């Protein structure tokens, strides 16, 4: 059995899909379906069982026998960069991760988990998996950063796989439940379908991010599991592309426009990553050599999926 926490969420459900694609269906999805809309991410997937997150935490803390587990993909977290309840964030993203990590270490179970490029904070270069380059801007980034530090202390003595992925700007199918935290491509597509012009913040040609397609993220997770590699790795394309490029790809798909520009929100100033670009040196050195989709390629595939029944 494989366990995927956050398995009804965005990246988690795409990992479940990737596992299904290689014939793996003995999957336990762990999630919190208080937001019932997330069920749609699972309806076309094959899983063996579902477990509520609170029940799962209680079970692993109690040390319950959950049978043979081939791996745990830990994608469950609060991923809102605008959430400022630090206790909630640390319980969800830090303590929960530690509980699962020790459950895996005690049983020799491969543990692959979601970290984040938010650990790098507001820097504009050297997005390298090293402490000197890490300075998160918000409590979400701090929760991910602190768990990475915790893992770094344990890695040298660990007898089983521990692998963290610093996700950059992930976009693609199954993110609709994320609301305001969904990708720019998702929101621009909705605006056009509602008969509006797509909207970007003023200066979006200067805001550049490393946008990575969620199918590529799932491929990275499966490859590292299948190859037993441990460490903390950036998971991006190694390219910085502008929000304008995303808008151009959406407009090109719909053959509509023009793009409207709106004022940059005051509340985001100083807490917004204006530039990200993954350094893939360590990822490539580990042996992962597959190419990553460009924004133009990924957005086209995503919008084809999003608009399949429109």
From Swiss-Prot:
Entry-linked NCBIfam families: heptose_epim, PRK11150.1
Free-text function comment from the UniProt entry: Catalyzes the interconversion between ADP-D-glycero-beta-D-manno-heptose and ADP-L-glycero-beta-D-manno-heptose via an epimerization at carbon 6 of the heptose.
GO biological process: one example: carbohydrate metabolic process
Catalysed reaction, written as an equation: ADP-D-glycero-beta-D-manno-heptose = ADP-L-glycero-beta-D-manno-heptose
Keywords tagged on the record: Carbohydrate metabolism, Isomerase, NADP
UniProt-annotated binding residues for substrate: 169, 180, 187, 201-204, 209, 272
Cofactor note: Binds 1 NADP(+) per subunit.
Name of this chain's protein: ADP-L-glycero-D-manno-heptose-6-epimerase
Residues the record marks as active site: 140 (proton acceptor), 178 (proton acceptor)
Organism expressing this protein natively: Yersinia enterocolitica serotype O:8 / biotype 1B (strain NCTC 13174 / 8081)
EC number(s) on file: 5.1.3.20
């Amino acid at each position: 059995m494989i366990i995927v926490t956050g398995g009804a969420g965005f990246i988690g459900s795409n990992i479940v899909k990737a596992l299904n694609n290689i014939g793996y269906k003995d999957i336990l999805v762990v999630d919190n379906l208080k937001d019932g809309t997330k069920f749609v991410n699972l309806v076309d997937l094959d899983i063996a069982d579902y477990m509520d997150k609170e029940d799962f935490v209680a079970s692993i803390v109690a040390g319950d026998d959950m049978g043979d587990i081939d791996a745990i993909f830990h994608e469950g977290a609060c991923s809102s960069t605008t959430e400022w309840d630090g206790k909630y964030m640390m319980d969800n993203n830090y303590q929960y991760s530690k509980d699962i990590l020790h459950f895996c270490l005690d049983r020799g179970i491969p543990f692959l988990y979601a970290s984040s490029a938010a650990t790098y904070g507001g820097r504009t270069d050297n997005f390298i998996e090293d402490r000197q380059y890490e300075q998160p801007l918000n409590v979400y980034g701090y929760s991910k950063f602190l768990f990475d530090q915790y893992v770094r202390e344990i890695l040298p003595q660990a007898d089983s796989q521990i692998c963290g992925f610093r996700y950059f700007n992930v976009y693609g199918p199954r993110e609709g439940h994320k609301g305001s935290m969904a990708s720019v491509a998702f929101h621009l597509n909705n605006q056009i379908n509602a008969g509006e012009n797509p909207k970007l913040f003023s200066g979006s040609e200067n805001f550049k991010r490393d946008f990575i397609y969620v199918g590529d993220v799932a491929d990275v997770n499966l490859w590292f599991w299948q190859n037993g590699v441990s460490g903390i790795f950036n998971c991006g394309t190694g390219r910085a592309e502008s929000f304008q490029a995303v808008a151009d790809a959406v407009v090109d798909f719909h053959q509509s426009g023009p793009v409207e520009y709106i004022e940059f929100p005051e509340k985001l100033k100083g807490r917004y990553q204006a530039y990200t670009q993954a350094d893939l040196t360590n990822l490539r050195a580990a042996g992962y050599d597959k190419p990553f989709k460009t924004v133009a390629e990924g957005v086209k595939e995503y919008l084809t999926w999003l608009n399949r029944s429109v």
